[in-house]
């Protein structure tokens, strides 16, 4: 990693632990900063805080005392999940203290070039596809960021022979200043996380931060299926490389069942190793990045053909007596579930849906769920999802939790059917995150098979 001295002997407050906060605290300590960590979880239930204290880092747990900011901190590094209306963050900003996320730290120390991937849906799959293609081509794509490996941790071990392939959320991108990827991808932009950002325009602005420092020597890969992406083209200094499944573009595109890059066939769409029209878009974005990095068509084709998907994103779990189970717990919004359903014959799908109630109506989902065999509905949003099912003419049953939903879905399915967990909602009404929800689905499927 690059050894930088801009944090040496500076007082830095790390707000919120989890993986990214813990990684940031250790990195800042290594760089000579005077680090204080503040986390809401009580110390006795906080292994990360206990570990950091043993390493000599100051920790304050069990709450977020505003008087802590009476100290003269030069910087705050916040956990990306903490909203900007948090009183600690509001006070820090009012005092003129810069508030960053650990993605910025990763950029500052990274010896490796960075490819950043953001968007409303498809981030994880596209990030993984890009990482696997680059690694197959000898460019060693190191996955990091929102995909589960803290960027600041991976950046410490990356050399200039590697490529940091970062999945970036809007939460993370709100906290960057100098962050400068060589290639950035925006998979798509849909109204999500409005409860965090306040409006769709603020959400788009957060995503757009990915390209703030890019120049004409850098490449911004955009989804030209969306008029919004086309409109944004004039608002960047970067060289835009489009991808589309709807039209021929000066980039990656679908035509007559083939995936092209600038007029050259790379592979057939039906050779992609994972189903669904959304994965064609993900593959096109990957092809654009790979070709910009000089990867040959055969390597791209072989890697994407063998691609097995990502856990919790249309993940094939098992087959029990001819009933296939797919875990799409990462589908936390309507668009993601629409795209998941596009890969299946509705008449053979039992869909498990529902979760955190964010006030959404699900009318947009009605055309996509019409013709489903059955639905199993759960969670805070159940009444709203049931209204959509009624409009679509789909019969449903209710469930108390994911385990109950999985069992009921299996009872409703017959040989040749698919049980699809694709909730179209966040998990936080019942579960800590979509991973926990998906893992419970996987565990229940395993129990059903016994």
Curated annotation (Swiss-Prot):
Family matches, as SUPFAM superfamilies: MurCD N-terminal domain (SSF51984), MurD-like peptide ligases, catalytic domain (SSF53623), MurD-like peptide ligases, peptide-binding domain (SSF53244)
Pfam families tied to this protein: Mur_ligase_C, Mur_ligase_M, MurD-like_N
EC number(s) per entry: 6.3.2.9
Localization in the cell: Cytoplasm
Biological process annotations from GO: cell division; cell wall organization; peptidoglycan biosynthetic process; regulation of cell shape
Organism domain of life: Bacteria
Enzyme class: ligase
Annotated ATP binding sites: 119-125
Catalytic activity: UDP-N-acetyl-alpha-D-muramoyl-L-alanine + D-glutamate + ATP = UDP-N-acetyl-alpha-D-muramoyl-L-alanyl-D-glutamate + ADP + phosphate + H(+)
Keyword line: ATP-binding, Cell cycle, Cell division, Cell shape, Cell wall biogenesis/degradation, Cytoplasm, Ligase, Nucleotide-binding, Peptidoglycan synthesis
Pathway, per record: Cell wall biogenesis; peptidoglycan biosynthesis
Gene Ontology molecular function, alphabetical: ATP binding; UDP-N-acetylmuramoylalanine-D-glutamate ligase activity
Gene Ontology cellular-component terms listed: cytoplasm
HAMAP family on file: MurD (MF_00639)
Family membership: Belongs to the MurCDEF family.
Function: Cell wall formation. Catalyzes the addition of glutamate to the nucleotide precursor UDP-N-acetylmuramoyl-L-alanine (UMA).
Name of the protein this chain belongs to: UDP-N-acetylmuramoylalanine--D-glutamate ligase
Organism: Streptococcus pneumoniae (strain 70585)
Gene name for this UniProt entry: murD
């Amino acid at each position: 990693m690059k050894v930088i001295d801009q944090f040496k002997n500076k007082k830095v407050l790390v707000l919120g632990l989890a993986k990214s906060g813990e990684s940031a605290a250790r990195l800042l300590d290594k760089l000579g900063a005077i680090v204080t960590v503040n986390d809401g979880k009580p110390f006795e239930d906080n292994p990360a805080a206990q570990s950091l204290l043993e390493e000599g880092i100051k920790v304050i747990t069990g709450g977020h005392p505003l008087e802590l900011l009476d100290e003269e901190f030069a910087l705050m590094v916040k956990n990306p999940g903490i909203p900007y209306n948090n009183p600690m963050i509001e006070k820090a900003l009012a005092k003129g203290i810069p508030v960053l996320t650990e993605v910025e730290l990763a950029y500052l120390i990274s010896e490796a070039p960075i490819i950043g991937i953001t968007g409303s849906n498809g981030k994880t799959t596209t990030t993984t596809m890009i990482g696997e293609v680059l690694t197959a081509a000898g460019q060693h794509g190191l996955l990091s960021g929102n995909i589960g490996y803290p960027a600041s941790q991976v950046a410490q071990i990356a050399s200039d022979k590697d490529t940091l392939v970062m999945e970036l959320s809007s939460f993370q991108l709100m906290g960057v200043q100098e962050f400068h990827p060589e290639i950035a991808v925006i998979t798509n932009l849909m109204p999500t996380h409005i409860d965090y950002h306040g409006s769709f325009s603020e959400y788009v602005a957060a995503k757009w931060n990915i390209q703030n420092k890019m120049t004409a020597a850098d490449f911004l890969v955009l989804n030209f299926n969306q008029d919004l992406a086309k409109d944004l083209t004039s608002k960047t200094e970067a060289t835009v490389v489009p991808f589309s499944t709807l039209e021929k573009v000066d980039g990656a595109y679908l035509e007559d069942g083939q995936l092209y890059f600038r007029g050259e066939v790379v592979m057939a769409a039906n050779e992609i190793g994972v189903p669904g029209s959304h994965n064609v878009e993900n593959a096109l974005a990957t092809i654009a990045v790979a070709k910009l990095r000089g990867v040959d068509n055969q390597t791209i084709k072989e890697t994407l053909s063998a691609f097995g998907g990502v856990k919790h994103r249309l993940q094939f779990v098992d087959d029990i007596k001819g009933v296939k189970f797919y875990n799409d717990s990462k589908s936390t919004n309507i668009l993601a579930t629409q795209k998941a359903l596009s890969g299946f014959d509705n008449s053979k799908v039992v869909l498990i849906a529902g979760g955190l109630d964010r006030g959404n109506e699900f009318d947009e989902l009605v055309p996509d769920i019409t013709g489903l065999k059955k639905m199993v509905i759960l969670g805070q949003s159940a009444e709203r999802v049931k209204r959509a099912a009624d409009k679509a003419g789909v019969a449903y049953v209710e469930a108390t939790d994911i385990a109950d939903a999985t069992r009921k879905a299996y009872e409703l399915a017959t040989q040749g059917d698919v049980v699809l967990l694709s909730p179209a909602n966040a998990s936080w009404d019942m579960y800590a995150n979509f991973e926990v929800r998906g893992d419970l689905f996987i565990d229940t499927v395993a129990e059903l098979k016994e």
